[in-house]
Amino acid sequence: MKSNTHPKYEAVVFNDLASGVKFLTKSTVSSKKTIEWEDGNTYPVIDVEISSESHPFYTGKQRIMDSAGRVERFNARFKGFGGKK
């Protein structure tokens, strides 16, 4: 087998920005930002906007996300696109 063909698989902390929940798991994703975990070890931390802790499908609750306005920006940008000349 070839060496150095697979990405590094290591423990990382995912930080859910919407709910503030952090969880430790393993992933090939890496980050220069680190955090000290409950066990005293330091791990890379990945910030995510939505995880199973904050997604309405998993929580059963409707939440308002602060990414509102994307549709309005899209419509404003392409308002005249495809119109008759």
Swiss-Prot record:
Keywords: Ribonucleoprotein, Ribosomal protein. It comes from Arthrobacter sp. (strain FB24). Pfam families: Ribosomal_L31. GO terms for biological process: translation. It comes from the Bacteria. This is Large ribosomal subunit protein bL31B. GO terms for molecular function: structural constituent of ribosome. The lineage of its organism: Bacteria, Bacillati, Actinomycetota, Actinomycetes, Micrococcales. PROSITE patterns: RIBOSOMAL_L31 (PS01143). Belongs to the bacterial ribosomal protein bL31 family. Type B subfamily. InterPro entries: Ribosomal_bL28/bL31-like_sf (IPR034704), Ribosomal_bL31 (IPR002150), Ribosomal_bL31_B (IPR027493), Ribosomal_bL31_sf (IPR042105). Part of the 50S ribosomal subunit.
